[in-house]
Amino acid sequence: MKAVVFAYHNIGCAAVRSLLEAGVEIAAVFTHVDDSNENVFFESVAKLAARNGIPVFAPEDVNHPLWVEKIRQMQPDSIFSFYYRHMLSQEILDIAPKGGFNLHGSLLPNYRGRAPINWVLVNGETETGMTLHTMTVKPDAGAIVAQEALAITDADTAATLHSRMTHLAGELLNKVIPQIVAGTHSLTEQDTTKASYFGRRTPADGEIKWANDSRTIFNLIRAVTEPFPGAFSYLGERRVTIWGATASEKTYDVTPGTIVETKPLTVACAQGSIVLHSGQAENGLYLSGDQLAAEMYLVEGMRFGPQASAVIAATRRQKVLIMGANGFIGNHLTKRLLDDGKYEIYAMDMSSSQIEQHLSHPDFHFVEGDITIHNEWIEYHIKKCDIVLPLVAIATPIEYTRNPLRVFELDFEENLKIVRACVKYDKRIIFPSTSEVYGMCTDEEFDEDTSPLITGPINRQRWIYSTSKQLLDRVIWAYGKKDNLKFTLFRPFNWMGPRLDSLNSARVGSSRAITQLILNLVEGTPIKLIDGGEQKRCFTDISEAIEALFRVIENKDGLCDGQIINIGSPDNEASIKVMAETLVEKFEEHPLRDQFPPFAGYNLVESQSFYGDGYQDVQHRRPSIKNAKKLLNWEPTIMMDQTIEDTLDFFLKTAVEETK
């Protein structure tokens, strides 16, 4: 049998040896270039392959068509993956007639995902094992070929368990590889109801929470000890890594984290205590617990805990700079941040009509100004604040053809200055991209990470807005890669609600669709349906959209860093015509209905006559919100009818007030 192997780490080496011992012809080994930032404590798959005369490769993207074709030319019967760190595409899996097989370090379906050896120790499991399973595009989900269990003892650490699992991998494969070669192996589907999934671990996950019980802390320490970065805690600003410890049931009536003895060095937990056997001060030597206490001058009553500066930073209210605070997104976001009470807002806009109620708030500092003029004020406040939201843009479709250069100057050039200032002062920017960047994409749902961004020809000037935003997205992404700019791009999909533009802006034709339609009802003029209103959009309630944006600002666990997030409601898809009909229905039922003229009907209008030359429309715009679900734990629930009702109510009451 001929195989192509994807392998890394000690377990990868053990697996390659098992294949060779079984007489499998290995056409090539794909592995990884060792990361200089990683503690490379493990054996080299590349060296093992080279010593056995096996061609070895380490491509950046093994799923690239060039590599797929190269693998196809090798004509493997089977594909094996042994602790290879990248997913293989379906194209690669389809090459091998006998299929693909992956070795996973747990008893599947438990502990699918990353770092299972560390996770089972963290969670205090008493058993783990090795599983060989068929490969599917979904990670660790294929049918089980063979499985061996392994008991976990209190003496196990990440190092010892990894060594034992490496040995187990060899034993398992020595039994099952001959069966695969002979075609006599069996398959058992996984019970998905018992599946659990765990993500990657980072060094930051090793911070000790002393409010846990001693057993939980002991499990963390042994799960991330050498050769991994280690569990750690702080004494003020002094970081201490704890390499070895035991759990004691003895409980002390003190605050968790308090040093209660120095010989042996003992720290109180919420329940029980931890006896430290070995540790290391930052930039210090690996020492016994007792010597560590002596050399760091530790005494009873001192307390381990979070880094002092981090505690201060966590309690300090973050400063947020909002440019365009009087706009639709800006005024709703301002209210949400002030209601939370953890943010201090600095804001600029050319008017304060929508935020007057906040002007006296002690945490709201507003300046009336123009971002094209007040460059020094803006740069000073970017330097002063923690988070920057540049919400100033021309975002009404008629302006794209009426004033294309003005759209470019404001939406791109002025915002580029802000982006560069964020790079200069190392500030986090949350940038409003737009659903318009997807243009005429034909995907059923627009995906932030995979959907193509397709715009029309140059003579269709309506695309200048989309292109300006897309280019800024690309510039921000490049700054993130090159200069470590902290950023999140969010893409609104037809956010709708009270204070979306104004009736006055609708009177001059510079508003979004629903506000324009409400003006028609208020003034008794026909509702204009551009090209019959057949274009479909996914309407999103502003309250839910702002909640998603608020969670982006919160950025729990840094999950939003470097991400693009669609914020929209895919289940609220409707044509402009249906939206208009719903609006008219709500209008006729409204308590203020008798204050306004009779409904004047619908007027079907060609887009060119309404928008002018250079316009081109999009027939559907439906977002994928997988990133919002995963990163923000956000999913919209408010239906379009309710949003239309709330929006209409606001503008009708506003119109009545204006006539008094």
Swiss-Prot record:
Keywords: Antibiotic resistance, Lipid A biosynthesis, Lipid biosynthesis, Lipid metabolism, Lipopolysaccharide biosynthesis, Multifunctional enzyme, NAD, Oxidoreductase, Transferase
Transmembrane portions of the chain: none
InterPro entries: Arna-like_SDR_e, Bifun_polymyxin_resist_ArnA, Epimerase_deHydtase, Formyl_trans_C, Formyl_transf_N, Formyl_transf_N_sf, Formyl_transferase-like_C_sf, Lipid_A_modif_metabolic_enz
Signal peptide annotation: none
Sequence segments annotated as region (Formyltransferase ArnAFT): 1-304
Chain segments carrying region Dehydrogenase ArnADH: 316-660
Domain of life: Bacteria
Gene3D superfamilies, A to Z: 3.40.50.12230, NAD(P)-binding Rossmann-like Domain
Binding annotation for (6R)-10-formyltetrahydrofolate: 114, 136-140
Site note Transition state stabilizer, residues: 102
Residues annotated as binding UDP-alpha-D-glucuronate: 395, 400, 434-435, 462, 494, 528-537, 615
Pathway: Nucleotide-sugar biosynthesis; UDP-4-deoxy-4-formamido-beta-L-arabinose biosynthesis; UDP-4-deoxy-4-formamido-beta-L-arabinose from UDP-alpha-D-glucuronate: step 1/3; Nucleotide-sugar biosynthesis; UDP-4-deoxy-4-formamido-beta-L-arabinose biosynthesis; UDP-4-deoxy-4-formamido-beta-L-arabinose from UDP-alpha-D-glucuronate: step 3/3; Bacterial outer membrane biogenesis; lipopolysaccharide biosynthesis
BP GO terms, sorted: lipid A biosynthetic process; lipopolysaccharide biosynthetic process; response to antibiotic
CDD domains documented for this protein: Arna_FMT_C, Arna_like_SDR_e
Protein family: In the N-terminal section; belongs to the Fmt family. UDP-L-Ara4N formyltransferase subfamily. In the C-terminal section; belongs to the NAD(P)-dependent epimerase/dehydratase family. UDP-glucuronic acid decarboxylase subfamily.
Protein name: Bifunctional polymyxin resistance protein ArnA
Species this protein is from: Shewanella sediminis (strain HAW-EB3)
